[in-house]
Amino acid sequence: MKVRNSLRALKARPGAQVVRRRGVTYVINKKDPRFKARQG
């Protein structure tokens, strides 16, 4: 999982889901797990 300042580019990928857990924003992508990231 990558830590990124901006998740905007990852949100646009096919299969991407934006999830908020305990105030932290994650992008999870089951189609292409390379694009898994958390905002930091």
UniProtKB/Swiss-Prot annotation:
Any GO BP annotation: translation
Pfam family membership, one: Ribosomal_L36
Keyword match Cell membrane: no
Keyword annotations: Ribonucleoprotein, Ribosomal protein
Gene Ontology CC terms, in alphabetical order: ribonucleoprotein complex; ribosome
GO molecular function: structural constituent of ribosome
Residues passing through the membrane, by range: none
UniProt KW Ribonucleoprotein keyword: yes
Recorded family membership: Belongs to the bacterial ribosomal protein bL36 family.
NCBIfam families: PRK00831.1
Name of protein: Large ribosomal subunit protein bL36B
Organism, scientific name: Streptomyces coelicolor (strain ATCC BAA-471 / A3(2) / M145)
Gene name in the database record: rpmJ2
